[in-house]
Amino acid sequence: MSLRGQVQIARSVFLLRIYILIWVQCLILMSVCAFCWLVLPHRLEQLFSSVRLTLSCLMISIVCLGLLRWAEPNFPKNVWILLTYTLLTSVAVTASGFHFSHRSVIYAMVATVTLFCFLTLATYLFARDVELQRSLLTGASTLILLLFAVFSLFPEAVSEILVMIAGLAVIVTSVVCDTQDILHDIEYESYIPGALCLYMDLMYLFVSVLYFMPSEPGSAHTAQTTVAATAAASPQFVS
């Protein structure tokens, strides 16, 4: 077998291990969700509407970062560019989470992106010098402005669905491109950043699938109405 064939097999096995890791984490997450659904079904249903709003903010950041990535083809392959990509996503999700007062989602996302930052820095601590690109500053500014504009001018459900579809298309395209790069084009110096980029794309793809889970927006309102009615009726019952 030629050296090129051996490298192809090694990269295919590496990709397979990444997908196995993703599936194991997804199964663990689904098991936890199923357990919570059985133990606290009403509490979980009340959280669906807030989770959907936060994931919509995440999709907006993915759309902006995807456009920035296509504008600069080498965007995700460099360690510092990838680190900036991760930090931009963290800023976008954190800002949107504070906008809707979803503190638990903020903490979870910050913990995830912090892990990616430490992995990237630890792997390429002595990387070669990298030229800073103006497109990063432009993309960061555009991301902040777009987040503000969309949620100020278009709060309806229609814009939420459009953003979700666009974000899903960007994620699927990114997964396909990253897979092809790891199999064929990526250099060994950028192998781990490329794998981390693929891992992030798959994580966002799984999060976007959770977005399409059916929810009952009126469940929280119904529960609050029931609690208020019970509290109002309690003094009359006692008297």
From Swiss-Prot:
Q: List the disulfide bonds.
A: none
Q: Where in the cell is it found?
A: Membrane
Pfam families the record matches: Bax1-I
Membrane topology is: Multi-pass membrane protein
Q: What are the entry keywords?
A: Membrane, Transmembrane, Transmembrane helix
- Give the principal location in a single coarse category: membrane
Q: Which family does it belong to?
A: Belongs to the cytomegalovirus US12 family.
This protein is called Uncharacterized protein HWLF2
